[in-house]
A protein has these predicted regions:
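A structural microfeature
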Residues: 6-7, 99
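Conserved active-site alpha-helix within GNAT-family acetyltransferase domains
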Residues: 66, 72, 80-100
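Short glycine/proline-centered loop/turn elements that form peptide/ligand docking sites
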Residues: 58, 81-86, 102-109
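Gram-negative outer-membrane beta-barrel domains
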Residues: 48-50, 95, 100, 113-114
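Conserved acyl-donor/pantetheine-binding loop and adjacent beta-alpha core of acyl/acetyltransferases
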Residues: 8-41
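A short, internal acetyl-CoA/4′-phosphopantetheine-binding micro-motif in the GNAT/acyltransferase core
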Residues: 40-50
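Conserved acetyl-CoA-binding loop-helix of GNAT-fold acetyltransferases
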Residues: 50-64, 92
Length: 117
């Protein structure tokens, strides 16, 4: 029996320079680097696209980020979309662009809660 993956994601932790974060995310954080969870990859197979799998994976990634944040003081989730279509996907769910890095999108964890409700 053969199995195939409909999609996957991967997470890691990191930090963002304060000036790279949008004002709404860096507010009240001083000049210290902002702790983030990086959504390093999120992909859905071509045959499974358009079925809500990407949204489900994003919700799962956010839930896991919330668990990490309880222990590590994470402020936001960060991703680097591979292309404009991916960027549009993330911005639909509240990710906002970095003022200094066009291909870097961030989601404040307070806003992320809305995506998983």
């Amino acid at each position: 029996m053969l199995f195939r993956s409909a999609g996957y994601f991967s997470l890691t932790v990191g930090q963002v320079d304060t000036l790279e974060a949008p004002e709404r995310i860096r507010k009240g954080m001083g000049q210290y680097p902002l702790p983030v969870v990086i959504l390093a990859r999120l992909a859905v197979s071509v045959v499974d696209q358009g079925r809500g799998i990407g949204f489900g994976l994003l919700q799962d990634a956010i839930r896991r980020t919330m668990l990490i944040a309880e222990q590590a003081g994470i402020r936001a989730m960060l991703t680097h979309p591979i292309d404009e279509e991916a960027a549009r996907f993330y911005t639909r769910f509240g990710f906002i662009a970095s003022p200094l890095r066009e291909q870097q999108l961030l989601l404040l964890l307070k806003d992320a809660r809305k995506v998983i409700q």
